[in-house]
Amino acid sequence: MSKRRVVVGMSGGVDSSVTAWLLKEQGYDVVGLFMKNWEDDDDGEYCSTRQDWIDVVSVADLIGIDVEAVNFAAEYKDRVFAEFLREYSAGRTPNPDVLCNAEIKFKAFLDHAMSLDAEMIATGHYARVRERDGRFELLKAYDHTKDQSYFLHRLNQAQLSKTMFPLGEIPKTKVREIAAQIGLPNAKKKDSTGICFIGERPFRDFLNRYLPTKPGPMKTPDGKIVGEHIGLAFYTFGQRKGIGLGGSKSGNGDPWFVAAKDIASNTLYVVQGHDHPWLLARELVAGNVSWVAGEPPAEGFACGAKTRYRQADAACAFGAATPGPAGEARFSLAFDDAQWAVTPGQSAVLYDGEICLGGGIIESAVIGQPGQTAPARALAEAR
């Protein structure tokens, strides 16, 4: 009886390396696949692709599996990076990891793996897949401190049916222990913390290579000009550092935060104080919707939601929203408690306990506390 073939996405990191070893120990026919998603010539000294490939080969030799490299740089630029630039140009703050998972790691990579006669694919993500009544559910990882279901919420039934997450039941500390015990050459390698195409370079320097600067006024909610910004694309909601403002002599000395963008007038709005009403949203509207089960929750469904990675689930009620210009689905969330710095372009991801339901891209939010009159504006909505 032939072994079931599983193609493992190997990055050169500890998580994917331990994933490959675990599956090999469980008797699978494991093949490693290294994805090159960014051309070295585009990234110079900041990209670690060469060293990552060396680490993948070293690990594959140690655990006794075949490994190959595949270049998805063209697909990445077309499906992920181009959208990344479009969103920043529109004043929003995208999350390319979400799109990369949906379009590259679980689409282009999955298709390539199937061409290698694989039955399944596996990655080192911290999440879980559960089959129940013929349907597949995406669950949070056992180690909630490392849970990555937020980045995986756009996966569909076809993708989940072919996916394994061996680390979903294992604490990160145990993964490090396994790597050391079996002598992986990359056992002490640090976890990657940035987007590959940005690397360790200052983010503003990177973005400036692709987007033009367009200076404009920096104003307070009452219209007072307090400075000049270098371009709306270079700021994000809730940002404190890099604004160029100290404590206001006429104010209370509290730190300044980016609170809003007016695309039409090229104005950046800033406020003083972490809990300023302009930084607190009680409702949001999201588009570009994707549901793991293929259909949305019921109107009024009480759920939890994250509007950024590592955020605790915030209690809210799900609702339908006015469709987009082309009739595309949207949804709304009404939170029990106001949420801080809800950012257009980021993902709003819904949960029913441990189950990730799916989500969408935040388009706008209603700011201010209940009972207060919030400024009549949409947060960086430029659609």
From Swiss-Prot:
Can you say where in the cell this protein is located?
A: Cytoplasm
| Chain positions covered by the region annotation Interaction with target base in tRNA | 95-97
EC top class, in one word? Answer: transferase
Reactions accelerated catalytically? S-sulfanyl-L-cysteinyl-[protein] + uridine(34) in tRNA + AH2 + ATP = 2-thiouridine(34) in tRNA + L-cysteinyl-[protein] + A + AMP + diphosphate + H(+)
Give the source's domain of life in one word.
Bacteria
Note the SS bond partners: C100-C196
Active site location? C100, C196
| GO annotation, cellular component aspect | cytoplasm
Keywords attached to this entry = ATP-binding, Cytoplasm, Disulfide bond, Nucleotide-binding, RNA-binding, Transferase, tRNA processing, tRNA-binding
Query: Where, in this chain's numbering, is ATP bound?
Result: G9, M10, S11, G12, G13, V14, D15, S16, M35, G124
Q: Which GO terms describe its molecular function?
A: ATP binding; tRNA binding; tRNA-uridine 2-sulfurtransferase activity
Enzyme Commission identifier(s): 2.8.1.13
Q: Which residues carry the site feature described as Interaction with tRNA?
A: H125, Q346
Q: Where is this region: Interaction with tRNA?
A: 146-148, 308-309
Q: What does this protein do?
A: Catalyzes the 2-thiolation of uridine at the wobble position (U34) of tRNA, leading to the formation of s(2)U34.
* Family listed: Belongs to the MnmA/TRMU family.
| Name of this chain's protein | tRNA-specific 2-thiouridylase MnmA
Q: Which organism is it from?
A: Burkholderia lata (strain ATCC 17760 / DSM 23089 / LMG 22485 / NCIMB 9086 / R18194 / 383)
Which gene name does the record give? mnmA
